[in-house]
Swiss-Prot record:
It holds the Pfam family HECT. Keywords: Cytoplasm, Lectin, Transferase, Ubl conjugation pathway. Disruption phenotype: Accelerated senescence. Its main location: cytoplasm. This is E3 ubiquitin-protein ligase UPL5.
Amino acid sequence: MTLSRSSADDSTNNANRSYSAVAGTDNKRKRDEDSSDYVGVAESLEMLKKQEIDADHMAASAQQTLISWRSGENSRSLSSSGECSSSNRPESTRLQIFVRMMSGGKTIVIHAEKYDTVEKLHQRIEWKTKIPALEQRVIYKGKQLQRENSLTYYSIEQDASLQLVARMQSTEHPVAWQTIDDIMYTISRMYKGENLQSNINEKIVTFFAMIPVESDESIAKYLNIFSNSSVPAALVMLYASSLERNKSCAKSSVKLFLSNCVALPKNQKNYCLPIVLEFCKLLRKVCPDQKLYVTCRNTLGSMLETFDNPHGVYNDQYETFGVEIFPFFTELTGLLLNELAQNSGPSFCDFQKVSSFWQQLRKVIELKVAFPIPIVLPMQSTALEAEIRHLHRLFGSLLTTMDLCMCRVESSLADKEVGNSETMSSSWSQYLSILKIINSMSNIYQGAKGQLAVMLNKNKVSFSALVVKFAKRGDDHQWIFEYKEATNFEARRHLAMLLFPDVKEDFEEMHEMLIDRSNLLSESFEYIVGASPEALHGGLFMEFKNEEATGPGVLREWFYLVCQEIFNPKNTLFLRSADDFRRFSPNPASKVDPLHPDFFEFTGRVIALALMHKVQVGVLFDRVFFLQLAGLKISLEDIKDTDRIMYNSCKQILEMDPEFFDSNAGLGLTFVLETEELGKRDTIELCPDGKLKAVNSKNRKQYVDLLIERRFATPILEQVKQFSRGFTDMLSHSVPPRSFFKRLYLEDLDGMLRGGENPISIDDWKAHTEYNGFKETDRQIDWFWKILKKMTEEEQRSILFFWTSNKFVPVEGFRGLSSKLYIYRLYEANDRLPLSHTCFYRLCIPRYPTITLMEQRLRLIAQDHVSSSFGKW
């Protein structure tokens, strides 16, 4: 009879199992971190609805089965003494219990006796779900069932619904567990249709308030309670409910959770990121078109911006992290492409979302892809293979779309009828940042960087315009210098100038200088070297002793005059280039002066300050000097304009027929350099035992390289170092010393220090001049321009200097000056000399009665000693 009873039990259980769903695997999957068995919430919701119906049928079927079984049982006599004690109890003690996993909406049916212990219930669940009993927690009406108590202790009745969740390995946070249990219980009741006054938000606030601060490990364990208890899935399930009150409650709770995450300190926020990512994945499957999903995705993006502990948070699952965020990056890139195609943006916020996902995705690729980067496509089987192929397609789409955008920019720049610049700027504002992401992508694929270079070179005008308009101080512009050839002078100058701090116009913070013209160099040295970099960043207030004039015009004059003194060969600091007297390089012999290091540091500061204040001082650097400032190697071609004789000799050595060269014993050359300094001749070995090492056709390239280095670089190494130190003092903090010069070509620096190479255009000068007290048609104005055209270029520059304290015109011409020029009528004697107010670019002349008298007066002030002393302010 016992055997017969057992068979009946088994058949009943088997029948019931045929209707029940398999549950309890999701939390175990989370503990095992096995994402491959993930079941989407959308599918789970459908399963849940079906299971509710199945459960009803199952309950009726089970009840009928039990009635039939009990009828048969009543007709039998139970004779076996080995039957379990429950067989002697009344049949009414038999319970049918529904056990549900909230994360997946799955339900199983368990049969038990009222007086069975909770431990027995755990064993039955283990038998059905394969989840170890020790890893289970069963919740009923918000309370966890303790294993030693009976089911009747908790008043569990027929068809009761219990909730199965995974037991955490640690019980360090019982209050947090209770808080989460309360949340899950409330969600369960609301989902069943109960109209409750929700306390979920209050519980979420409580949960966040208890996050530990002791260590990353304790933070991770604590926050895992939230995800391992399936709260994200439960809230999303509630949000997908057809009841508006449920949807509203879930929406409020999710948004509260997100805002609390964002407000956390960085280390705690890092460990919240996997939970936010889980919310995003769930919402994307259930409601991708609703605002809550967009809010969640945006929150994830903002958290990714500061996420810098991937290995601590994801351990060995970092590759999985990359796979999980890739769909969001793809989605956002698609939106970005659409906005670009429509010429409607994107906005900074839209771009920032794409950028934050890309930065993390790039790190994953660099760390996890087994192949060397750049990658050659197609690849063999590797991590992230599908994502890398898809990413390459996105790169192509972005490159093509930005090509079209750049063409539109160039067309707009050429179209004078285009709307105001602010409207244009709003639609172009993120183009440069998007190009930066495209460049970052191009580093991953072989040949991609060349494709980007072709596109930028093709769109040089628009690319340069974007750099000038949108490259801002403090941004990372280093990537642009990989495409230096795709930029023009204005773009490169703009990028270099961004390395300087803003010139402040606050008179209270200006560094004041009162200098005697007769002692210009030494007094200027004391004022500049004795000041801190911060004081000089605050601006300069310049005044010459016994003169009334002050202001920007006087400052421009001082810059010009002090640079003329510094680079005067009589002062032995610098030497003129043999082939171009406008160019200078440090004098190797200057080291005999004990003050020479300080004077080169002073020179570096003065040149940097002149560039900061956009004053053309009229000196040019020798190419060799410029290359050393940029930290670049000097080649043979670089000395062509520095020492033509040595250049020709070295070139002849390198181009000579190898057999002829060797047959003539390398012209008798050895690895030495003959020098003469301060009348003393010396022989310097270019390498160890250089006197004994003969030059031949195989080592002549090495000989020339060493010769150039020893002849041009080594002798002025200390001077270059001191100049760089002074120059770097004037740059913004944390800017590498050589970065300014690396951003430029030598010709760019020429334009910044001396202005345009072309002769002054009188027509351009006239076009940028306005009149006060005169009309353009007055004969005095006509005479003025005729006289100016007759003057030599040096006389014209002297007039310009008297007028503006600028002796050189910017590369762009007169439009490059900070203001238009003005001719004012002087209401005094009609034969007096002109006056000027250099700060305001204002020239004052009387109404001269004859052209001859005007020419006399203008030629008088065109003399250097006059043009430097007649201006007022």
